[in-house]
Amino acid sequence: MIINSNIKITLEERSNKLEQSHIEIGLLIGQESEISEQQTFVLGLFPTPLNISNTDDDNNNKPINIDSISSIDKEWILEYCHQVNIMLYGGIDIVGIYMIIPDSDTLNEKNNESFIMKLLKSIHTIINSKSLQFISYSKKTGLINGKATNSTQLYRLKSTEIKVINNLENEFLSLHCILPIDIKLKSKNGMISFENLKKDIIEIFENQLFKESTLLIENEFVSGNEIISQQFKSKSKLNIDLLINQLDSISTSSLEFNFNNNNNTHCIAYIHQLEQIKTAFKFIKKDIIKSVESRFDLLFNEISSNNNNNDNDQDNIKLSKESPILELPRRVNIQWLSNKISICDYLSSNGTIDDCYKIINDLLQITSPKINSIESSKNNNNNNNNNNNNNNNNNNNNSKLSNKKENNEIKENKDTQSNLTKSTSQQQTKQTNNSYLIIIISVLVLMVAFYFKFFV
């Protein structure tokens, strides 16, 4: 097990805030190596929020502290796994759990290890990993102990070596893929089965979209067996293009309802620098499917709560034919480890950025989170396009008015010049006529003078 140096620091800080008898449990976040089956990278951790006591008076509801391992609410932990799993990009997964305990002997108490094994087995069904890691931190000694388990071991915990690396996140590359998809589905009588819908989507992606696609990294077609850091040296961010035959839409049948997926879906995955390129493709494909699934999960919950569906019909969502276009939640990119690795959240059509801040603070206990980017909605894009079109029209109209004005000015100038030319020509003609008249008079005067001199 290779862990980030920040994990030990975080465990020490959180241990100092706990009372001596209390226990803290949380999730380990990282990546399993595809090359080495025995190697797992643990990048960070998320403490599980304390459950709240249910009382009639909301003001008296208080967090329930964990006094023993057996008092841990397993269902609460599993629900937390579901929530966190949605917020992780491709390649980043829940790789295990950690506990801050009073003393290392706590694990040896009766039934405690058995409880942890059962908890890890339940988590394994959610994240579907090859193995799971378990880290315990003793408040008494300040030491970290590492164990691992998997299904072949029947989830029995076995000790494992822990290697600490400073800034482990710097050994990871980010993969980015922009995928434009509008999902079109037909419903019978305005009802859609939620589970069938998800199955259809996964089948469409895996059997149609991905099978007939070609993946390029940095506009290059590369062998899947190459080590990614050797092929792309000195790069920490790589762009992936997914070339498919049909990119505009995914359709199961003739259209009745449109699920607007914001035109461009920004998919992200992270991969350790020593992994193979085929693993990078696997992680980015996983993020594409996971992103669409998560959006439908959230949309289903929103529609169900609005429609007040009966308990007997929880799997179906009722759609209104008056609103054939449903906007899927938008993805929000949130900074997590420095500026290297991010997590995500989703904003519903009625959600605000304040909702996102609250979820991050309450669920992940990240104070003052930094949001890197938010997917723009299609409506906003349309509005922007309309504004651009209006601006273009205004510019065209202004251009036409300007041209018309210029033409009028040119015409006026031409008329003026024509008048000036005409006036000048008239003046010149008048002057010429006057000259001719003077010459004729002068000749007549000379002829009269000559006559009187010689004949009279």
Swiss-Prot record:
Predominant localisation class: membrane
Species classification: Eukaryota, Amoebozoa, Evosea, Eumycetozoa, Dictyostelia
Family stated for the protein in its record: Belongs to the ODR-4 family.
Membrane topology designation: Single-pass membrane protein
Location(s), subcellular: Membrane
TM segment ranges: 436-456
Biased composition annotated in UniProt, kind: Low complexity: 374-401
Biological process (GO), any one: protein localization
Domain of life: Eukaryota
InterPro entries xref list: ODR-4-like
Stretch list, region Disordered: 374-403
Annotated keywords: Membrane, Transmembrane, Transmembrane helix
GO CC, alphabetical: membrane
Function comment: May play a role in the trafficking of a subset of G-protein coupled receptors.
Protein name, per record: Protein odr-4 homolog
